């Protein structure tokens, strides 16, 4: 692992058999050359500014689910303590989280507090550089960042003690701002391997290709895609809307408990955004949650959040309902800046 860590820090892999990796692809590209066998390692190199996916060492793929809650606008310091959820066990609990860029030691997160319960939808908004995307990357264990303080508990487990792939298999999923292409690997093969990796983790029976196909057809309906989509290579030649729907399809197949959607609305026209939002809403249950990172109010018109959090200078400074986003849209960040 050490030999490929530097170049694969923005990567995920899924493999039935893991061959030796002698020379990882360069960072600037989003394409990766693979062998013709879908059971080979799938090394998907992401651009440096993409959201980090958990690094999956063998037959693993990231799983998603997100959430949190509160009712009216409050200061972030009282967020954890003031919630009226006595007796409820949080899905995700973040306390005083601090993190730096591993290489430069620049501090980005400066005491983030957030509590997410099952069945909630949370949105994190903020200016560029506020720390919101870094927060999502730290949650999934991106190696470019180092946690220097605080705690993250997911489903009662200390997330900071878990490797990125273990976080993924535990039920944490993260979507990409710019989903990568995987030439030579069909969606069907990709999803089947990811699904069975999750099943193995849960100690459940795996599905053969015929059984999996039957399972997958209903998931395609959720994301408004036809069955011939399964024969296409992962994200290759896809439109922006198709790539985002493919991300949601992965979420639907994997059944994660917490989904982190990092700017899933970026680059989408209104029709594509509505399709993606409809798919996300169709996956919400009382047992899973969603954490959305976004710049824009328009996403919140289609996916209604339980709570909205405003980040500034590495901290959540305000939490409230949808009226907070409308105030932001009308008056800008100056109206709520700490």
From Swiss-Prot:
Its primary localisation, in coarse terms, equals: plastid
Q: Which GO terms describe its cellular component?
A: chloroplast; chloroplast stroma; cytosol
Q: Which UniProt keywords apply?
A: ATP-binding, Chloroplast, Nucleotide-binding, Plastid, Transit peptide, Transport
UniProt-annotated binding residues for ATP: 126-133
> Single Gene Ontology BP term?
thylakoid membrane organization
Task: Tell me where the signal peptide lies.
Answer: none
UniProt entry tagged with the keyword Nucleotide-binding: yes
| Compartment(s) | Plastid, Chloroplast
| Residue span(s) of domain ABC transporter | 92-338
Q: Which SUPFAM superfamilies match?
A: P-loop containing nucleoside triphosphate hydrolases (SSF52540)
Q: Which InterPro entries match?
A: AAA+_ATPase (IPR003593), ABC_transporter-like_ATP-bd (IPR003439), ABC_transporter-like_CS (IPR017871), FeS-cluster_ATPase_SufC (IPR010230), P-loop_NTPase (IPR027417)
Q: Where is the transit peptide?
A: 1-66
Recorded superkingdom? Eukaryota
The free-text tissue note of the record is: Present in all organs, with higher levels in aerial parts.
List the GO molecular function terms: ATP binding; ATP hydrolysis activity; ATPase-coupled transmembrane transporter activity
Q: Does the keyword tRNA processing apply?
A: no
Q: What does this protein do?
A: Essential protein. Required during embryo development, especially at early stages. Involved in chloroplast differentiation.
Classification via PANTHER family: ABC TRANSPORTER I FAMILY MEMBER 6, CHLOROPLASTIC (PTHR43204:SF1)
Q: How does it assemble?
A: Interacts with NAP6.
The record's similarity note reads: Belongs to the ABC transporter superfamily. ABCI family.
Q: Which NCBIfam families match?
A: sufC
Q: What is this protein called?
A: ABC transporter I family member 6, chloroplastic
Q: Which gene encodes it?
A: ABCI6
């Amino acid at each position: 692992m050490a030999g490929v860590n530097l170049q694969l820090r923005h990567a995920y892999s899924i493999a039935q058999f893991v061959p030796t990796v002698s020379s990882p692809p360069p960072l600037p590209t989003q394409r990766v050359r693979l062998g013709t066998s879908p059971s080979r390692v799938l090394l998907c190199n992401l651009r440096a500014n993409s959201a980090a996916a958990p690094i999956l060492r063998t037959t693993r793929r990231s799983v998603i689910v997100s959430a949190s809650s509160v009712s009216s606008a409050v200061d972030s310091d009282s967020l954890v303590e003031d919630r009226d959820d006595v007796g409820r066990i949080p899905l995700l609990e973040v306390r005083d989280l601090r993190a730096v860029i591993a290489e430069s030691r620049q501090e980005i997160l400066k005491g983030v507090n957030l509590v997410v319960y099952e069945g909630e939808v949370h949105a994190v908004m903020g200016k560029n550089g506020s720390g919101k995307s870094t927060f999502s990357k730290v949650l999934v264990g991106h190696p470019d960042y180092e946690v220097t303080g605080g705690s993250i508990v997911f489903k009662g487990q200390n997330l900071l003690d878990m490797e990125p792939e273990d976080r993924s298999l535990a039920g944490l999923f993260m979507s990409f701002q710019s989903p990568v292409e995987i030439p030579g690997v069909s969606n069907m093969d990709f999803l089947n391997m990811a699904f069975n990796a999750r099943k193995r983790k849960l100690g459940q029976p795996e599905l053969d290709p015929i059984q999996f196909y039957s399972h997958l057809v209903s998931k395609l309906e959720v994301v408004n895609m036809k069955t011939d989509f399964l024969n296409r290579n992962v994200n290759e030649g896809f439109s922006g809307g198709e790539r985002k729907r493919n991300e949601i399809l992965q979420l639907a197949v994997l059944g994660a408990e917490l989904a982190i959607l990092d700017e899933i609305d970026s680059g989408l026209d209104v029709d594509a955004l509505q399709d993606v939002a409809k798919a996300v809403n169709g996956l919400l249950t009382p047992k899973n949650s969603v954490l959305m990172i976004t710049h824009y109010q328009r996403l919140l018109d289609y996916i209604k959040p339980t709570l909205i959090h405003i980040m500034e200078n590495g901290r959540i400074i305000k939490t409230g309902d949808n009226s907070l986003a409308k105030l932001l849209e009308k008056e800008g960040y100056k109206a709520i800046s700490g």
